[in-house]
């Protein structure tokens, strides 16, 4: 077993914070304004990149229409949605424990960089992380795979001693594509089918340190 403490890379939505209320409220308002009827359960849009669900919601729309829909959503999220959010129970304690042990901690999210930074600042979590990676494009063009690859490369992390911790299949697939292990955050928004594809499953934030140590 390596004596190097693993670097731990956390997803944001559904892993560190419960962002569903703010996301779904803004989605509901924007879809009403666009007269998009019966979109189905909105919670399925928590986690995937905005650009992915604009295609689903506007299957016959133009790229310009999808960009405008994304902009309208983000305008609502910028005004009010980002604050309609909370830190999951046990996450602060988990981060404090991992930091005390000495694990380097990072955030990698498909959310736009400035939103991620604002949310972490709101909850006074920024100081716990070495770096925060989100998308910087207005209409995001980077996949979670690419964002994670950039983080690993720019911080000279070794895939053998790095974990991705997230709640959705996008986190698991990004970890697999970058040849790092993934710990599923079982308290988040993912399904049992998604969690089954991870290397390990943490039922609560309190389980993370022990699972990483035992790996």
Model region roles, listed by residue range:
Residues 90-102:
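Catalytic-core regions built around general acid/base machinery
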Residues 2-93, 114:
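N-terminal helical cap/lid subdomain that shapes the substrate entry/recognition surface
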Residues 105-107, 164:
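Conserved hydrophobic beta-strand within the GNAT/NAT acetyltransferase core sheet
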């Amino acid at each position: 077993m390596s004596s190097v403490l693993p670097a731990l890379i956390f997803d944001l939505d559904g892993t560190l914070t419960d962002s569903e209320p703010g996301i779904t409220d803004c989605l509901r308002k924007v879809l009403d304004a666009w007269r998009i009827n019966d979109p189905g359960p909105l919670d399925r849009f928590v986690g995937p990149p905005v650009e992915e669900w604009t295609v689903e919601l506007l299957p016959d729309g133009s790229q310009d229409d999808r960009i405008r829909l994304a902009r309208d959503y983000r305008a609502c999220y910028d005004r009010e949605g980002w604050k309609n959010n909370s830190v999951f129970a046990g996450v602060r304690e988990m981060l404090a424990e991992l930091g005390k042990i000495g694990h380097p901690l990072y955030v990698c999210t498909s959310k736009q960089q400035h939103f991620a930074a604002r949310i972490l600042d709101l909850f006074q979590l920024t100081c716990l992380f070495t770096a925060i990676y989100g998308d910087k494009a207005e209409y995001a063009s980077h996949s979670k795979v690419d964002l994670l690859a950039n983080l690993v490369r720019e911080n000279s992390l070794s895939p053998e001693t790095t974990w991705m911790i997230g709640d959705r299949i996008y986190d698991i697939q990004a970890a697999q594509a970058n040849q790092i292990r993934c710990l599923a955050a079982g308290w988040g928004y993912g399904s049992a089918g998604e969690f089954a594809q991870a290397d390990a499953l943490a039922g609560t934030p309190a389980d993370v340190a022990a699972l990483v140590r035992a790996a």
